[in-house]
Amino acid sequence: MITDQPKFTEAKSIVLKTIFVFTEFYCQMKWHLIHLSCLICFSQWLQGQAMKTKICLDQEGYYPKAPKIAVVAGSSGDTSEFPRDKTSFYIIRENTSDTVFSGELGGIRFSANSFLQTRVADFSALESTGSFRIAVKGCCHSYIFRIQEKVHRYTAVASLKAFYYQRASMALEPEYAGKWNRRAGHPDDSILIHPSAVSGNRKSGSVISTPGGWYDAGDYNKYVVNSGISMGTLLSAYEDFKFYFDTLHTNIPTQPKQVPDILKEILYNLRWMLSMQDPEDGGVYNKCTNAAFDPMVMPDACHQPRWVVQKGTAATLDLAAVAAQAARIFNLYKTELPGLGDSCLRASEKAWLWAQQYPEMVYDQNSMNQSYEPRILTGGYGDKKFSDERFWAASELFITTGKQTYREAIKTLIDEPFGLPSWSETGLLGYYSLSRKGWPSISGSEKDTIKTRLIRVADKYILESRKNAFLTVMGGRKSDFNWGSNANAANQGILLIQVYLMTKNQRYLDGALGNLDYICGRNATGYCFITGLGSLSPLHPHHRPSVADGITEPVPGLLAGGPNPGEQDHCHYEFHEPETAYSDSDCSYASNEIAINWNAPLVYLANALELLENNF
């Protein structure tokens, strides 16, 4: 047996090798079959993802002396429609069909944010005014657009007028609201104290009055934190461009008569915010809310009980900042609004003291719901970091009062890493206000910090825009596309305008204008994202009045959220990549809702450009 062992081992080895070779062959064949199957699936996926080649441009139009960019966009790999060879484009006057300009499309660019390829049509040299189309030989033609002075006047006015349509607790009259008139809803004069909000003389179930203010978004609740960033942005627009806004009319109720329309609108929400402060201790309730969202009905059909809920550091500091800024602005109108500025400042300083006593009071709705009834299921706005709100509030209070205590807080916090403004990130609003109003009162090193940081961010934006397939700052990085992405575009534009005001460098103003072009149609979806504007704009926003009023057109001037690959609403999206994940559906609160904190930066951006591009 021992002598036969080698023969047995050799035979076994041959068999094992044969099995191994066959197995390897089988595995390779299986891998190739799988690979082929994947290629077929990928090809089918691409066909499913195919987007018809189109010309994406600012559907509202262009200023005569400003850059004018349009983008031909189509699916990568498309050989049927997308122009691949050297191709001309033509600008055709709409009323005569005359060609007034021609040029060559730029080279093919591949988007880092989707499956799209693009070619750029640059017609900045065309300064003739009128209505035009762009035509690309053998491909496509654009929507009609205009070249004219004040081309974004309607964008500017409509975006501000949108806040009037969001007013709670009052009827919107036909004289001001047109066909979008409606009855009053949510009087909010009998609001219950939620068990989470009990303090002093305000017991659970006791009643306070907190009428007015703006509905926050597509729902009918009112949130201090989101009002904070919205109000700060609008107040800053007025401070930066006072003489422009003094003469801007939006057809809203006229009282107080001598106060500019933007401040009348701000005042409607300011009075509500002030009513959200506990007069006993200075803390501010997070929101005035139902326990659960109202259904898709008009405001006057809503009769659920309403509550104010737990106070929080973020809400309190937001009021401190807004009220301090409002104090100095409304003190310009002491005759029309006697005592308002003083009331705002008292509220602001009282809020600051509460936030000093409770520096880390987080509004954690999930935790709150484990302890108190009724459970609150509306938007949380649960910020957990407060250095940005504290810096913003300190900046506004220092500018308004000059007091050293706020000066010290600025010194402590000025080096914090503040991000692009949003409801949870307000620090840069302090930078903007200090550069606008506080420059003489801060040190040289603090000025350098503010200026250097803002310019560094702006320069990065401009650099990234040159690599973007649509040549806009928006979309320079994938992270630009999230919930409320269009507000990122508008807030990037504001930052660029702030740096332009510091430096007078034209490239920053051009970058801001490019982001307004993005919002108005120079983007991968081809939509102008503002209701009632352009040739292709949202018809089905997640916005209760627009859904329930029986009118085909949505309430105008509202900025839709924009592409959001998170798709948290689980609605139908035709495309799913960062810059294409948008659904014009009232189901889609993740991409097609509206919100006051998205409209506010649009107001700033559109109106600033109307002023700066027209040498107002």
Placement of each model-derived feature along the sequence:
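Aromatic (Trp/Tyr) and acidic
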Residues: I55-C139, E149-K150, Y165-G228, G232, ...
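Short coil/linker segments at helix-helix boundaries
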Residues: S236-Y268, Q304-W307, Q325-C344
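Carboxylate/His-rich catalytic cores and anion/metal-binding grooves
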Residues: D261-D281
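Proline-centered turn/helix-capping motifs that create local helix->coil transitions or kinks
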Residues: Q277-N286, Q357-S367, G402, L463-K467
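Solenoid-like repeat scaffolds
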Residues: I414-L420
